Amino acid sequence: LTPASLARLICPEFRFGKTDPEEAARLVELGVGGFCFYGGTADEVREASRSLKALSRTPLLIAADYENGPGQWVRGATELPTNMAIGASGSEALARRKGGITALESRALGVDWVFAPVVDLASRPDNPIVNVRAYGEDPGLTARLAGAYLSGLNSQGALGCVKHFPGHGATATDSHLALPVLEKSLHGLEREDLQPFAALARQADSVMAGHLMALALDESAPASLSRAALTGLLREKLKYNGLIVTDALNMKAVARDPAAGVKAFCAGADMLLCPEDPFALHAELARAFNNGQITGSAVALAVSRQEALVRKLSPFRSSPPPLDALRCPEHLAFNAEAAPACLAWLPGKPDLEFRPGDIVGYFEPLTPPSAWKGTAFVGELIKLGVRVEPYQPGCGMRLAAGIFSKPRAFSGSINLSEEEKLVLEAAIKGAGASVIVAFGSPFVLGGLEHKPSAGLCAFCALQDFQLAAARVLMRRAKAGGTIPAVIGDL
């Protein structure tokens, strides 16, 4: 066993504007198995991928968290609808197309391995980190659409990663900040959260192990560090034979444990993602090998799983798409075409209609007009003949409230703050007819004492989805989706 063999177990982060390229070059010399890219311009990402791969003696896997397309992280690339928007449509064709576009643009950037799809279930409105990243709360819908997305990725030469095993949906803690505890019974996990992982076990290129304490599986270690979870359940019971990668080891759920990387490998992980100090982790792995905690055969098996992924990529690696594949007309058209099928009215409420000549007050809680995020929505209403003004309470004017709430790593919160909820309810109470348009989390529509006349969910704030929401309200388009989760207390 060589030091480079141990290094191949490590996949450090490469954060543009922060990571020292010389340090990255030293990591390549050490023999790491790949990098996870964050940020950057298109030119920067492609050049970093090219130069790192050229330095490496073994094939590098370049990964990125492009859940909603590369445009989520890379300026100049296409951002695509959230999983929950696709879930609302129920369309495998849209899921597959999202995967295909993501793969083409990722490969144009030199990224081979997309850390998607999320198959966590949207089973808790207060979950601060899953929410619209999930397809919905139904495991069957999730497995079906995630499978279609994976087929789209693979068809265009990129690898996927099903995450976050054994399911992060039923928690209320962001694992970037602390260790979530999942209190479901084993029967509950098998009936719900584990279903997508079981259904996709043969199809998934890789599975990401989540940093969450699933008490029904292991009361002493989070799933990412648990042999009972990774080997006993995922490998032996679910018959998954592909590569297991940890979630980022610099997340606070496990970062305080200096032995987390070694524990994860001993539990059954094949690649150790984004450690705080990759060189220190390499030294820890070497010590664990020297004292017999890690065996050469286990390392060889993990490396062989990496090599299997590299072989899967080999037909595509010699001919990456050109950079002009980014934001090409066909990819941009996808969002406009998909939007009407993804938008969904709140059930149990009448569909609200605006007409040319109507005066409508627009409102975003605690946000002055100069900072509105819904400018495309407002602009389209005006274009279609509505007179839109900043909402004035107590005038009896019709109200359109735009809510932009989405999961953000390290924020620890989601949906509306108490202050936002108070000002929103006051606006609804003082309005004539009112509609809340959720350009993100649909759960903002639940739990309000003063409820709107209607609710429309777009599940994301992409420009084409804002335009579609305005057209739906003007009866120029039909909202064809169904909210794929239960919105409580309507």
Q: Where do the language-model regions lie?
A:
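Second-shell residues forming the walls of enzyme active-site clefts
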Residues: 26, 35, 40-64, 70-74, ...
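Preference for extracellular/luminal or secreted protein segments
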Residues: 1-31, 236, 257-490
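Second-shell loop/turn segments in exported
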Residues: 16-17, 37-39, 83-93, 131-139, ...
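Surface-exposed, active-site-proximal loop segments in enzymatic domains
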Residues: 75-88, 124-135, 174-180
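Active-site mouth loops of central-metabolism enzymes
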Residues: 7-19, 83-97, 178-192, 250-255
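A substrate-binding/cap region within the structured catalytic cores of diverse enzymes
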Residues: 90-111, 118-134, 139, 146, ...
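Catalytic domains of carbohydrate-active enzymes, especially glycoside hydrolases
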Residues: 24-38, 97-113
